[in-house]
Amino acid sequence: MERALIIGATGGIGAAIADALAARGVAVTRRSRSADGLDVTDEASISAVLGSLTGPFDLIVIATGKLDGAGNRPEKAISEVTAEALADQFRVNAIGPMLVLKHALPLLPKGAPSVLAVLSARVGSIGDNRIGGWHSYRAAKAALNQLIHGAAIELSRTHKQACAVCLHPGTVQTPFTAAYAGRHRTVPAPEAAANLLSVIDTLTPAQSGRFFDYAGAEIPW
């Protein structure tokens, strides 16, 4: 791996992935809303920021997202669901990453191996949903998973050595998760980044369109 592009590179996990890659000697390009004005809810800003880059990148990581929808905590009951929170979650956690992918595709090599990794969440798995709750966030992440799965199918026709996957990083110690970790084991962002990169290092085109956790175990859709 020689060149990597990290979207969401000032967030806890995105920054840790970028730092870990740089420590390996990879040439890392970092882009984010706070540093570069890349707003995943604004396609014009996505197009402008990514359109200014010159590829190809061996690795593109989309590490954007949020838990709170329209300023509300994740719902514990159906009665707490609002249209505003649902729409906000889909804008940030599904539509935004897909638009980033759309404008990032020209930055992937067509004749060489590459990985496009999008951070998802285990709670977006329909098959693994046993306790309910977090309705807006779950639904948005499930939609993201479907979008990436479909994109991987299309990508296989044009970039035969590419691998596009969704990755669950675990519960990472960041401001993003601080209020919701509860009894779940949390890991520091550098450890989470190392875990994810260990998975990314082993990916092949045959695994494209799938959903993996930080240990490389496949998660059901």
List PLM regions with ranges:
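Hydrophobic structural elements of the Rossmann-like NAD(P)H-binding subdomain
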Residues: 61, 69, 117, 164-167, ...
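C-terminal helical subdomain
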Residues: 162, 166, 174, 181-221
